[in-house]
Amino acid sequence: MAIGLVGKKCGMTRVFTETGASIPVTVVEVDANRITQIKTNDTDGYQAIQITTGERRDSRVTAAQKGHFAKAGVKAGRGVWEFRVTEEELEGREAGSEIAADLFEAGQLVDVTGQSKGKGFQGGVKRHNFSMQDATHGNSVSHRVLGSTGQNQSPGKVFKGKKMPGQMGNKRVTVQGLEVVSVDAEKGLLVIKGAIPGANGGDVIVRPSIKA
């Protein structure tokens, strides 16, 4: 694992290359990620950096959270996240310090994790890309129905995991191997090629690509 950043999805736009090619990009706003705790093998059984970002009203922060943030000397954020790290990555990091957008550079590949948009209860055609049945030729009221879900007396059941209608979206999704087009450290912006999960304004986690 490696140190990443927590940011907010701003939306999509496009940028142009020197040759005039249009590239679809997503803009991620990265406020300072404040380190709230350094976890080590000796004290916690694993190595990680815990961070927070953004702000939260004082009335929304519990007494335990206030003590945790005060111990690190940072403002209360809208949540806490952890990144598993190696000993080398822990060097120079301490509670109270900050990690900014310049952690990444243009051309670097990243993995982006977010909460996908919820679509509610959907049928097999929309949820799993099933084919529709005949529109005519004797078919009635079954145009978007799944059809058979199994065999016969043997095995006499529907196997677990069978694709069926149900809740679609609102799940943790990671898109791998996206390219960082540009980084604006002053404004705290990451411009990433392609689409990333979630709605505008949602929290996203940006990490160095695990497959790079």
Swiss-Prot record:
Any Gene Ontology CC annotation: cytosolic large ribosomal subunit
UniProt xrefs under Pfam families: Ribosomal_L3
Keywords: Methylation, Ribonucleoprotein, Ribosomal protein, RNA-binding, rRNA-binding
Molecular function GO labels: rRNA binding; structural constituent of ribosome
Ribosomal protein in keyword set: yes
Record PTM: Methylated by PrmB.
Spans through the membrane: none
UniProt KW Transferase keyword: no
In-chain residues carrying the UniProt-annotated modification N5-methylglutamine: Q153
PROSITE patterns in UniProt: RIBOSOMAL_L3
InterPro entries (alphabetical): Ribosomal_uL3, Ribosomal_uL3_bac/org-type, Ribosomal_uL3_CS, Transl_B-barrel_sf
GO biological process, one term: translation
Span list, region Disordered: 147-166
Family: Belongs to the universal ribosomal protein uL3 family.
Complexes and interactors: Part of the 50S ribosomal subunit. Forms a cluster with proteins L14 and L19.
Role of this protein: One of the primary rRNA binding proteins, it binds directly near the 3'-end of the 23S rRNA, where it nucleates assembly of the 50S subunit.
Protein name stated in the entry: Large ribosomal subunit protein uL3
Species of provenance: Psychrobacter sp. (strain PRwf-1)
Gene that encodes the chain: rplC
